[in-house]
């Protein structure tokens, strides 16, 4: 790690290690326990990529209950002071003042632009449209990150499908979570698919499930379906 990086807050050794490991990677997951400072690592990563002229836009997506923390605490505390920055965030319903603020951010030049959204917004058409707009406009030099990425573990959820589609528009992708598995190993698939198509080497969720899940055929009258009763090959 370069020693001349102008960190706003001094990183711990494990944070430097995480930053070193994501260097040069367009897709990366910060699987770090709560309280270890993964938010700071992401912001240092974004700042580093900006100084290397790799990105000039980042969209950070987090659960509704915490996404304001990024705006009010994490970014002001940790993002590098030397970098000129324009930050804005999602609001629903969108006020005229916020629309003007976002338009100024879009037009800003010579600055790192950071936009923060709550993940729940991507279940709506408006949220989807905003994400797609930013991806098409800034994605070639942009980064998309999902904080608490288990919020997109359900491969059937509308927001999951939307964010996987939008992620393909961005050059850099990051996910953050204490543990990517909260229920079953199947939780991994959509989070990794967000990082990149076939990231786990499977063409679909069902191919992934067929490999690692033990399935039992259930018949209820004229209806039949596959039920997961266990897992294999996960050691």
What are these regions (language model features)?
Residues 185, 234-235:
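Amphipathic alpha-helical transducer elements in NTP-driven molecular machines
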Residues 231:
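Aromatic- and glycine-enriched glycan-recognition loops and surfaces
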Residues 1-160, 165-171, 199, 203-228:
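SF2 helicase/translocase NTPase motor core
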Residues 43, 74-75, 184-196:
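PAPS/PAP-binding and catalytic site of the sulfotransferase fold
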Residues 33-35, 170-185, 193:
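Conserved helicase ATPase motor motifs in RecA-like P-loop NTPase domains
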